[in-house]
Design a protein with these regions (language model features):
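Conserved P-loop NTPase motor module
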Residues: 192-254
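Glycine-rich P-loop/Walker A and Walker A-like loops and their local beta1-loop-alpha1 context
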Residues: 43-68
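Conserved nucleotide-sensing/catalytic segment adjacent to the nucleotide-binding pocket
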Residues: 81-149
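Post-Walker A helix-loop "phosphate-sensing" segment adjacent to the P-loop in P-loop NTPases
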Residues: 67-75
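Short, polar loop motifs at secondary-structure junctions
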Residues: 75-81, 166
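N-terminal pre-Walker A segment at the start of P-loop NTPase domains
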Residues: 10-40
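Feature marks short, highly hydrophobic, charge-poor N-terminal signal-anchor/signal peptide-like helices
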Residues: 1-10
Length: 254
């Protein structure tokens, strides 16, 4: 019996050492590629809107940027251990509207978010469809105020993704400063390759975009922690198994 305990102890120690080495390997500091540096700087600089066809890899790009930055953030879906999941109705400037700003009737409110913690909104076109612009204006008049003043209020940015640029609520679209199109995702086993194009507006009065860069982004599979079929669990009374979730991530479908 003593020999069995010794063997089990040795196996346990070996397992702990192996897991520790793997964690250190996965989270080791690596030199950022040009594409990664551009992404980190762009998301730190301004509000970014990511768009692309269904399954192109929009959430994969969000998850990769979040992993690169390694900072606390807020989102409507859990991308990583650093995500604080929020309801999107929490994105507001209290009960203050543009009318209150004009009339000087500002009502102070308690801070909801921490300083310098960005917000990532997945599938903005589902939550804020442009077909409901008028209703959204009436129901959430304070959200656009937050979007316009987020740098003043919390020194943060608000990033969104959607399938088509024109699909989200106009009040959200007009606050974007940078646009990234995800063309496709290719599976390479232990990593995914995302083809992206960066754009900016030609001028503030035009919705036409001009291309500024093109990159292929390498995304290690191990850094993807989110459920690529999140809305299945939101809407359907069933849940993917851990194996099915990992299979979806490795396939690069998001």
């Amino acid at each position: 019996m003593t020999a069995l305990y010794i063997v089990l102890g040795i196996v346990g120690i070996v397992a702990v050492v192996f897991i520790t080495i793997m964690l250190l390997f996965h989270h080791r500091k690596v030199k950022l590629t040009e594409a990664d540096m551009w992404l980190v700087n762009e998301f730190r600089r301004c509000n970014v809107m990511v768009f692309g066809k269904k399954g192109s890899g929009k959430d994969v790009l969000f998850a990769h940027v979040i992993a690169l930055r390694g900072e606390k953030h807020y989102s409507n879906i859990p991308y990583s251990d650093n995500t604080e999941v929020i309801d999107l109705c929490e994105i507001n400037a209290g009960d203050n509207t543009f009318e209150d700003c004009i009339n000087g009737d500002i009502e102070k409110f308690d801070p909801r978010f921490e300083e310098c913690c960005d917000i990532y909104i997945s599938d903005a076109g589902i939550y804020f469809p442009n077909t409901m612009d008028k209703k959204l204006d009436d129901l959430y008049p304070s959200l656009p105020v937050f979007m316009a003043l987020s740098r003043h209020l919390y020194n943060n940015n608000v990033h969104t993704n959607c399938q088509a640029l024109g699909r989200p609520w106009k009040k959200i679209r007009e606050q974007a400063d940078s646009y990234i199109q995800v063309l496709r995702t290719r599976n390479r086993g232990d990593h995914l390759l995302l083809s992206i194009v960066g754009y900016e507006q030609i001028d503030v009065n035009s919705e036409r975009l001009t291309q500024v860069c093109k990159y292929t982004v390498r995304v290690p599979v191990w850094e993807l922690q989110y459920d690529s079929r999140h809305f299945r669990n939101v809407f359907l009374n069933c849940e993917l198994t851990p194996f099915e979730k990992m299979k979806e991530l490795i396939s690069g479908r998001s």
